[in-house]
Structure formats: structure tokens, C-alpha cells
């Protein structure tokens, strides 16, 4: 199975009042050609699809035209899209039922049942090969705000936010391990900063105070993340 991981498209962004739609279109055209040339089976988009929570009709059309063209050129392509901190989770997820019928899974929200338990099932997606058999399980975790994460014991000594994120990934990993068969991979997605990564003051606005949203890289064996605004080592 061949996967391509990308993020932070920021469709609809302007730079000093200059509309960047042409640049974004050139990127999407390149990405489409790359998907075909490399015969990609799964495209992972790790958040910040749009630059703001109220994207223009033009930028929304740009996304949906790309998705349609990708499916035409690669009919078996699977796509997994998670919301980032710039996205409106509800707006991104709204066409989800229609997109899912065409191989595109969109996860914007963390949902809970009446008892307050997080719906883990919708965050764990099977990825299938050309023969229809499951080859990998994807932990599709969108951008997490403090209210999204499970509560941890007050006497654990951990930061409630970071500990809650780690717990959520452990719960999802345990669920994936229970489902996986020999030879099946487990792939974790997220949209977050990592401790030690360089933050761009020019393009990334802070929305959580004090750096508490920056995750220690040690909680992951491997991370397919979005939110980095420049090349960095973590």
C-alpha cells in the first residue's frame, strides 16, 4: 500500500491582500499528477484544508473539484481528511456522508455518547487494498481542544490536556490492535505542534495560551501530523 501524507493547504489564504488561488491551484494540479505518477492508494490530509473557518465559495469549489478529479484519475484512491485549527470542523464535515460514498473520509469533530464517552469507532478507519482487504488502520484524530480530550486522574501528575491527548491515542491504538490482523499497519494522524519544533511567527496564529498544545514527541512511535508552518526537526 502506497500512502501520501500532506497537510496545511490553507485554501483561500491571502498574502498582503493578494489572493493565492492561482498558487493553490498549481499545487493541487501537481498533487494530482503526483498521485497518479506514484500510484498512491491513500492520501492523508492532516488538517488546515482551509485558511479560515468561513472559506469562500471559490476555495470550497477548489477542494471539491480536486477531490472529484482525483477519483476520476484514480478510481480506487482512498482519502482521509482531518480538521485543523484553522478549519471549521462542522463545515468541513458537513458533506461527509456524500464524500464517504466516493472514498473520502472527513473527520472534523470529536463526538461523545450520552454518557460522555468519546466515540472511538468513528476515529478508526480501515484502509483497504486493491483486493478490498484491509491493509491498515488509520487513527484519524482532528485538532484537539482541551474540551475534546478524555479526562485523566487528578492525581496522575500529568498535564490534563497532554495526558488526555496521550490517553485518547492509547485508547485508539488499543482498539486498532484489537482489530488488526497479521500484516496490517496502524497509522496515526493528528494536527498539532510538537515540543522542539520551530514555530513560524509569520503564518501561524496562537490559539492556545502558554504552549500547552505542544506535544512531546515521545508519546508517538511515528506521527503523520499537520500544523507545521515550516520545515522542522522534532
Question: Language model features by range: what are they?
Answer:
Residues 1-45, 50-233:
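Extended recognition/assembly regions associated with phosphoester-bond processing machinery
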Amino acid at each position: 500500500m502506497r500512502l501520501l501524507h500532506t497537510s496545511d493547504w490553507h485554501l483561500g489564504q491571502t498574502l498582503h491582500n493578494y489572493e493565492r488561488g492561482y498558487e493553490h491551484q498549481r499545487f493541487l494540479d501537481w498533487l494530482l499528477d503526483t498521485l497518479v505518477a506514484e500510484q498512491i492508494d491513500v492520501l492523508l490530509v492532516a488538517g488546515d484544508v482551509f485558511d479560515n473557518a468561513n472559506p469562500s465559495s471559490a476555495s470550497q469549489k477548489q477542494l471539491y473539484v480536486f477531490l472529484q478529479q482525483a477519483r476520476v484519475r484514480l478510481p480506487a484512491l482512498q482519502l482521509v481528511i482531518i480538521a485543523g485549527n484553522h478549519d471549521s470542523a462542522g463545515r468541513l464535515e458537513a458533506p461527509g456522508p456524500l464524500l464517504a460514498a466516493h472514498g473520502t473520509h472527513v473527520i472534523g469533530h470529536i463526538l461523545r455518547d450520552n454518557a460522555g464517552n468519546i466515540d472511538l469507532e468513528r476515529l478508526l478507519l480501515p484502509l483497504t487494498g486493491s483486493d478490498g482487504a484491509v491493509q491498515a488502520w488509520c487513527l484519524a484524530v482532528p485538532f484537539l481542544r482541551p474540551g475534546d480530550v478524555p479526562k485523566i486522574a487528578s492525581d496522575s501528575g500529568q498535564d490534563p490536556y497532554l495526558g488526555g491527548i496521550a490517553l485518547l491515542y492509547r485508547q485508539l491504538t488499543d482498539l486498532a490492535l484489537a482489530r488488526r490482523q497479521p500484516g496490517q499497519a496502524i497509522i496515526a494522524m493528528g494536527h498539532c505542534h510538537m515540543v522542539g519544533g520551530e514555530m513560524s511567527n509569520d503564518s501561524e496564529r496562537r490559539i492556545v495560551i502558554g504552549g500547552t498544545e505542544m506535544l512531546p514527541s515521545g508519546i508517538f512511535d511515528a506521527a503523520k501530523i499537520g500544523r507545521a508552518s515550516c520545515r522542522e526537526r522534532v
